[in-house]
Structure formats: C-alpha cells, structure tokens
A protein has these predicted regions:
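N-terminal regulatory/sensing modules of transcriptional regulators
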Residues: 1-82
Length: 82
C-alpha cells in the first residue's frame, strides 16, 4: 500500500490556508495536509522534506528562498489580487 501524499501549506492567513486545505482535501481525500503559519515553523518540522507539494505565500517563499529554490519543482507560490 502506498503512503498518502503529504501537502504543506505555508501562509500567515489562516482562513485562506484552511480554505485551500479543504479544496485540496476534496480533490485528494487521502492526502495529509499540514498547515504552517510561517516558514520558520515548516523549517523546524521533522518531516519538512517529506512533502509532495508546498503551497506557499509569496512572502514566505522570500523568507525561505534557498529552501524553496531547492524544491522549486514541488513549490506552488500563492498570490492574491483582484
């Protein structure tokens, strides 16, 4: 049996993160979704390299630029606009 994919959401906006987590959960019911408010929280996590994808706010990508640059094929930058 394959392990469930793990998805990290790194964004300071809790409401947006929970909403995105719900959308992802509906598309991938078996996925493990972890929410982090800031890059520092993700960086301290023991499983920080185990994620299949990282959904990250633009500000947090800049904070952890070297981390996300090494994982650019897994990183999806979240932006907001009108």
């Amino acid at each position: 049996m394959m392990p469930h994919p793990a998805i990290a959401i790194v964004a300071p906006n809790t409401l947006a993160s929970v909403g995105l987590a719900d959308i992802i959960h509906r598309m991938m019911p078996g996925a493990e979704i972890c929410l982090f408010s800031h890059f520092a929280e993700l960086n301290q996590a023991e499983n920080r390299d185990a994620f299949f994808h990282y959904f990250v706010s633009a500000a947090e990508v800049l904070t952890g630029a070297s981390f996300f640059l090494q994982r650019q094929h897994k990183t999806i930058v979240l932006t907001h606009g009108e």
